[in-house]
């Protein structure tokens, strides 16, 4: 398991006048973010502990120990919260933390280099893997078993089976 900090949440706008904030949790179970103990900023300069949490529409509403006013809460808007990697539970087979995938080499099933994994996105319809080739625009591909049949963390690469549209095959249309 790689070391370092993993981003598990982002603080949003204040909620109410007593220092509560909206919190977007990046954990599978949104409430698990409070199980990891104190959360820190990326630079480690500030530490936050969740005193209470409740579910809202698409986020949590939390109170943080030591944050008691709306003004204090407003200053935290946009702050990302991290935990040490070793505090996270181990992944199941075919499950990965996004942080483990970032920076891996991306190669085709024939071994040709495609680039490096720069991000994993989810816009609501499933995970998307973003690959930056050595030159040109990035590739956004569905992170499915069909398109990404192999993830090898030990070797440091993902194997990509590019869809036909990506490979540049000509469509089966007579007018093309």
UniProtKB/Swiss-Prot annotation:
A Pfam short name: RimM
Gene3D superfamilies listed in its UniProt record: PRC-barrel domain, RimM
Gene Ontology CC terms: cytoplasm; ribosome
Compartments reported by the entry: Cytoplasm
Primary localisation category: cytoplasm
Keyword annotations of the record: Chaperone, Cytoplasm, Ribosome biogenesis, rRNA processing
GO biological-process terms attached to the record: ribosomal small subunit biogenesis; rRNA processing
Statement: the UniProt record of this protein carries the keyword DNA-binding: no
Ranges for domain PRC barrel: 93-166
GO function terms (MF aspect): ribosome binding
Superkingdom of origin: Bacteria
Protein function: An accessory protein needed during the final step in the assembly of 30S ribosomal subunit, possibly for assembly of the head region. Essential for efficient processing of 16S rRNA. May be needed both before and after RbfA during the maturation of 16S rRNA. It has affinity for free ribosomal 30S subunits but not for 70S ribosomes.
Domain notes: The PRC barrel domain binds ribosomal protein uS19.
Family under the similarity heading: Belongs to the RimM family.
NCBIfam families tied to this protein: 16S_RimM
HAMAP family assigned to the protein according to its UniProt record, in alphabetical order: Ribosome_mat_RimM
Cross-referenced PANTHER family: RIBOSOME MATURATION FACTOR RIMM (PTHR33692:SF1)
SUBUNIT field: Binds ribosomal protein uS19.
Protein name as it appears in the record: Ribosome maturation factor RimM
Organism the protein comes from: Rhodopseudomonas palustris (strain ATCC BAA-98 / CGA009)
Lineage: Bacteria, Pseudomonadati, Pseudomonadota, Alphaproteobacteria, Hyphomicrobiales
